[in-house]
């Protein structure tokens, strides 16, 4: 359910449970190859949860208004590239859903050894094509902690 703008922490295209499970299963298979070629990925946290539409510190009124009018709407997402840095792993996605991120993506994991955070997926520069696959997400509002 949409919230007044001042109460919003972020708005996301939250993956459906089926899509989260599908992405986690796909990622677990990829992780074997990643660990073989990137030796610093031994301890990590898995996410596979959402594509950020906007975080409150950068959210424009236009984006907020769009999200209110599309609240709880489902969107198809196509995963098309895998990105890896020393701090984060993500899939780049195509979707008709709006996002204020330069690159639309879903964070898959962060590296505990390098103190990676989900925001670090915004700074991935190395991407490789993957066999595209479909996911689905729902526009969801997340409230600030008070």
Task: Describe each region flagged by the PLM.
Residues 2-146:
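Histidine-dependent nucleotide/RNA phosphoesterase domain, centered on the 2H-phosphoesterase fold
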């Amino acid at each position: 359910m949409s919230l007044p703008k001042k109460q919003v922490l972020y708005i996301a295209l939250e993956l459906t449970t089926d899509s989260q499970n599908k992405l986690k299963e796909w990622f677990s298979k990829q992780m074997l190859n990643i660990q073989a070629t990137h030796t610093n990925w031994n301890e990590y946290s898995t996410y596979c949860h959402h594509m950020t539409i906007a975080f409150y510190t950068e959210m424009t009124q236009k984006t907020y208004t769009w999200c209110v009018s599309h609240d709880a709407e489902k969107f198809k997402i196509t995963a098309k590239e895998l990105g890896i840095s020393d701090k984060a792993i993500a899939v780049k996605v195509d979707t008709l859903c709006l996002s204020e991120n330069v690159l639309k993506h879903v964070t898959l994991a962060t590296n505990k050894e390098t103190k990676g955070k989900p925001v670090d997926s915004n700074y991935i520069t190395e991407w490789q094509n993957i066999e595209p696959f479909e996911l689905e997400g729902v526009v969801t509002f997340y409230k600030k902690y008070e």
